[in-house]
Amino acid sequence: MHILIVHFGLEGVSEEQYEGQVESVAPAFAGLPGLVSKTWLADPETNTYGGVYLWRSREAMEAYKEGEIYKGMLANPYLKDVSARDFAVFEGPSRVTRGLLAEAAA
């Protein structure tokens, strides 16, 4: 398992407009191979938005980062200062603390 955390600011688009855009693209994420779950993030007070992705493997995450959806996000002129960081998951203790509920439901 791997987690990818992405965050960025919005520029030239309102939070409401952004939310409408992500509502329309969410189904594309649901079909990504190896994606267990994506949680969409928003902090309007600091203009910070993004997502937390749980992947079945590092390879699935890397394939996403080489794909059109990720490249499109990086090229989006309304998203500024995009930052991404990935982490391996300690699966045993994460299951104990219910950190992998989505994976268990799959």
Language-model segments: what does each one mean?
Residues M1-T48, R58-E66, P77-A106:
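Short S/T/G/P-rich N-terminal loop/turn motif that feeds into the first structured element of a domain
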